[in-house]
From Swiss-Prot:
Part of the 50S ribosomal subunit. Signal peptide: none annotated. NCBIfam families: rpmD_bact (TIGR01308). Keywords: Ribonucleoprotein, Ribosomal protein. InterPro entries: Ribo_uL30_ferredoxin-like_sf (IPR036919), Ribosomal_uL30_bac-type (IPR005996), Ribosomal_uL30_CS (IPR018038), Ribosomal_uL30_ferredoxin-like (IPR016082). The keyword Chloroplast does not apply. This is Large ribosomal subunit protein uL30. The lineage of its organism: Bacteria, Pseudomonadati, Pseudomonadota, Gammaproteobacteria, Alteromonadales. Belongs to the universal ribosomal protein uL30 family. The keyword Ribosomal protein applies. One of its GO terms (biological process) is translation. It comes from Shewanella pealeana (strain ATCC 700345 / ANG-SQ1). GO terms for molecular function: structural constituent of ribosome. GO terms for cellular component: cytosolic large ribosomal subunit.
């Protein structure tokens, strides 16, 4: 069975944000505004997305 993936796009800047939130964006593989990555839909990734929900947009692929 194929694993689900999520398309995560950074929509806001990380400048002036908490260091943990910046590190979370890096952990997701995001580098700049409008950068999009595809990640596996796992509980740990969902937790990271929930932590920085105000800076990213998510689509199911």
């Amino acid at each position: 069975m194929a694993t689900k993936t999520l398309k995560v796009t950074q929509t806001k800047s990380s400048i002036g944000r908490l260091p943990k939130h910046r590190a979370t964006l890096t952990g997701l593989g995001l580098r700049r505004i409008n950068h999009t990555v595809e990640v596996e839909d796992t509980p740990s990734v969902r937790g990271m997305i929930n932590k920085v929900y105000y800076m990213v947009s998510v689509e199911e692929v």
